[in-house]
Amino acid sequence: ETWAAVRPTSSRKYLQDERIHFINLNLSSEEELEKELAPHEFDYIVHAAGATKCLHAEDFYKVNTEGTKHLVNVLLRLQMPIRRFVFVSSLSIFGAIREEQPYQEISEHDTPKPNTAYGKSKLEAERYLDSIGNNFPYIILRPTGVYGPREKDYFLMAQSIKQHVDFAVGFKRQDITFVYVQDVVQAVFLALDHGMNGRKYFLSDGEVYQSAAFSDLIKKELGNPWILRIKAPVWVLRIVTFFGEYLGRMTGKMSALNNDKYNILKQRNWRCDIEPAMDELGYHPHYPLERGVKLAIKWYKDNGWL
């Protein structure tokens, strides 16, 4: 059986398969979680729930760090007979490291230096899992930028290009990596099947791209509209994201251009080493950027997003 943890207010629009069962989980309360999970016994758990945008930095910790702690604590207290627990973390836990050219791949042996509240909250969740040690069968996945159907951040780029504007930041070379959502799913199932306890794996499509590669492919799939390509210095982005953050807090609506986004867009090196995932999990990405963008844009068109 497959169960999906949802909130009472969660949309189930894309969870229409009749084989899916639903369970309401409140990750903010261990007491509530214990009541909700006690009647069940799960063999495998994929913890992909998390916040990527918050008005206040502390909210990242409440959801991404504390929510993970609460879930794991309750599973241990209930002595749930879990075979494997896959935690979906992020490459963002490492922050801007190995930024000297020529850029080198970020590896599992590097010291994380997260520069976003999101990355810091994910790292704290990882460290909590590490602190439990062999008492809990966990595997951690660290995908780079994930794109595909229903993803909203990269969709904003496609929407902007359709409106004839492509915006980039910084004049220093930027090496970017991507991973299509289906390749992340592949890695999740491989980790569930034979992942080694306590191991951590980076995920990408195995290639490295320059900053314009993604927008060029979007442009191609949109029929090559004319575009105004704007490349602004980093200090302009700093001003825009500062006011975006301020207005977001004033209006209660988080801006896509905020303080975390500033650090993400400013970062120049997103290379990562996926060899351990390939060697140990048997992970082999099937969606290079051109194929993935084609599928993503088709979905956006078919579903009226573009």
PLM-predicted stretches and their roles:
Residues 124, 151-156, 169-192, 198-199:
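Substrate-positioning beta->alpha
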Residues 191-257, 290, 294-297, 304-305:
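Mid/C-terminal beta-alpha module of Rossmann-like enzyme folds, strongest
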Residues 21-66, 91-96:
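NAD(P)H-binding glycine-rich loop region in Rossmannoid oxidoreductase-like domains
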